[in-house]
């Protein structure tokens, strides 16, 4: 399950990934971001995926990158801090970080929420 809420004071979109996460879940999550007209054009995302179990293959991340590329047209820039703490989640996240190198999309992997928030607040 993926849930989200935006903190308008900090401009950070807080996202929680919990339980089983599939490719379909990720694509739907990215598509929803495109439809949110009230989000800032400089979007900062903090995703807590520490309790998620990803049912993905590395090749699935190409589809996520393609959907994100389409969504990015709506935003000036997106900063995406992704918090993980399991081996498979970390491996998939680092692979995606290398794959998703786009001019206006910055994705970083963190092991703590505090480090992720510090990065987003420093931008």
Q: What are these language model-derived features?
A:
Residues 1-123:
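Amphipathic, Lys/Arg-enriched alpha-helical "gate/interface" segment within cytosolic domains
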């Amino acid at each position: 399950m993926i849930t989200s809420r935006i903190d308008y004071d900090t401009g950070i979109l807080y996202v929680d990934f919990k339980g089983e996460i599939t490719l379909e879940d990720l694509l739907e999550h990215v598509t929803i971001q495109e439809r949110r007209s009230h989000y800032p054009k400089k979007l900062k995302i903090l995703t807590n995926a520490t309790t998620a179990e990803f049912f993905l293959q590395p090749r699935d991340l190409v589809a996520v990158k393609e959907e994100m590329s389409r969504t990015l047209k709506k935003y000036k820039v997106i900063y995406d801090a992704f918090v993980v703490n399991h081996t498979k989640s970390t491996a998939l996240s680092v692979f995606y970080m290398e794959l998703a190198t786009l001019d206006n999309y910055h994705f970083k992997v963190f092991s703590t929420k505090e480090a992720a928030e510090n990065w987003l607040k420093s931008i």
